[in-house]
């Protein structure tokens, strides 16, 4: 089974396209995905990029996806090391990298 870590940008994209994941793929994310997703959708509504109803629909869709959310001590420890090694100002992105290192085959992001 292929395991993929996704960030909130990809989660929103999946919801927008109403994508269906394959049975032989597992989606993973740090537990902080929920708060980041909520914040991104709120910001999009606040900027007038989507309606509150659209944001709720996307949030509901993502909640229905089979995403394994993780946030244990080992993940946090590795995220700290990743952020420190790369000189990042926080550990948010490092949690996604750490989870990929620990449990996944790839990190999927829309970042360029």
Give the ranges of each region predicted by the language model.
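Short amphipathic alpha-helical interaction patches enriched in hydrophobic/aromatic residues
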Residues: 41, 45, 66, 83-86, ...
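Acidic, metal-associated active-site segment
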Residues: 90-106
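Short, well-structured N-terminal submotif of metal-dependent ribonuclease cores
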Residues: 1-34, 44-57
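Short beta-strand scaffold positions
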Residues: 6, 29, 70, 91-94, ...
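Short beta->alpha linker loops
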Residues: 32-33, 74, 95
């Amino acid at each position: 089974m292929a395991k993929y870590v996704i960030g909130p940008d990809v989660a929103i994209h999946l919801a927008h396209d109403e994508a269906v994941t394959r049975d032989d793929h597992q989606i993973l994310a740090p537990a902080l995905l929920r708060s980041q997703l909520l914040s991104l959708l709120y910001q999009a509504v606040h900027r007038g990029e989507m309606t509150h109803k659209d944001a709720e629909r996307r949030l509901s869709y993502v909640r229905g996806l089979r995403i394994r959310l993780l946030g244990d001590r080992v993940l946090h420890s590795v995220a700290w090391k990743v952020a420190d090694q790369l000189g990042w100002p926080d550990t948010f992105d490092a949690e996604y990298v750490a989870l990929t290192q620990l449990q996944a085959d790839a990190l999927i992001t829309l970042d360029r």
